[in-house]
């Protein structure tokens, strides 16, 4: 129906693979099917858990995180805006062949002036192009993990008020209540994903 839905919640001390694997396995055990797409950052623990539990699902590396990650490979501060614009130029292509062509063009552009950046782009940017396998009218919503980041920010903001928690169960209760409220808002709110078109 195009509505967002929270499928589960978990409390863990880290983003280690074992925690993600446990969470994703619990979703599978509850009967959640194989997703058509998983969008996330490139955290190694999460990537390993996805391979172990949802290997059949295509993975889209969050384009926003890719933009941020590129900063580490830019040799001069004065190049930051240009590089950001070039990455956006790739992401805003009409289709995958055009995105690949633009990527090759940009990699070539930086091969001499910023070889580490060019190598990083060549290896990392394709992970953010999986979205081109999906209809154009839903790509914008699925190309980043911003929805999850916003959700996590809301949880942090509302749990910070409570301060310290005596045990894991108490924080899980509060987080679950917060997520139930948000889920109800989503269910009664606007459609998040438009009906899929064939083009």
Where are these regions (language model features)?
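RNase H-like nuclease fold core
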Residues: 1-39, 44, 48, 53-56, ...
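Conserved structured core elements
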Residues: 14-21, 40, 44, 81, ...
């Amino acid at each position: 129906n195009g509505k967002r839905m929270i499928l589960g919640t978990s409390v863990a001390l880290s983003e280690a693979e074992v925690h993600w694997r446990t969470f994703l396995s619990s979703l599978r055990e509850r009967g959640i099917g194989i997703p058509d797409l998983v969008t996330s950052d490139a955290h190694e623990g999460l990537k390993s858990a996805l391979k172990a539990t949802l290997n059949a699902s295509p993975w889209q590396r969050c384009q926003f995180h890719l933009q941020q990650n590129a900063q580490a490979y830019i040799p001069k501060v004065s190049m930051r805006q240009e590089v950001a614009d070039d990455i956006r130029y790739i992401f805003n292509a009409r289709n995958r062949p055009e995105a690949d062509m633009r990527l090759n063009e940009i990699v070539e552009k930086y091969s001499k002036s910023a070889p580490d950046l060019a190598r990083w782009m060549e290896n990392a940017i394709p992970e953010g192009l999986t979205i081109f396998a999906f209809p154009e009218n839903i790509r914008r919503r699925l190309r980043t993990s911003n929805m999850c980041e916003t959700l996590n920010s809301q949880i942090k903001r509302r749990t910070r008020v409570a301060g310290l928690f005596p045990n894991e169960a108490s924080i899980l209760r509060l987080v679950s209540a917060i997520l139930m409220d948000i889920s109800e808002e989503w269910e009664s709110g606007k459609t998040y994903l438009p009906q899929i078109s064939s083009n």
